[in-house]
Amino acid sequence: MKNLKSIALAFVVALSTLSVTAQTKQVDASKSTINWVGKKVTGEHSGTVALKSGALVFKNNALTGGTFTVDMTTLTATDLTGEYQGKLNGHLKADDFFGTDKFPTSTLVFKTIASKGNDVYTVTADLTIKGKTNPITFDITTKGNNATTALKIDRTKYDIKYGSKSFFEGLGDKTIYDDFDLAVNLKF
């Protein structure tokens, strides 16, 4: 009888450890989107950048982790066409902005996650752009095989100071605001 109880206890422990095993869901980079908007005194520009790879980690259907790599060489303005699009794309990839020849990728690594309920989580992560890492906090929603989030990033924290009134005086209508926005839709 004692052996039967020991076996039953071992079985229960084994089952309980199975239920808390982490499940890593690889993001389908080809179906996921990252849209950006950068604003200036006289208007704004918008575009896309491609996700290179990424994964979300779940335990008991709750988000517990995530890592992402963005291909900065794909940075593209979509609000312009022709020559003007080419000029803006080139400038955004130059050292004044993202320096994509030297820094072809950016990364995001989740550090802490708190559930807000209804598949919404508050995430604090380390964001690395141009070799500089800073914490960022945002909400992410997960539903089925989809996750969405919006991030506001202060580019000056990553040594992207071009056109920033925080660093240069007398820019007038040439001022570019420090924050840019990302709208992210992940498919996995």
Where are these regions (language model features)?
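Bacterial Sec-dependent N-terminal signal peptides
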Residues: 1-25
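Low-complexity, acidic/polar, glycine-enriched regions of mature
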Residues: 21-188
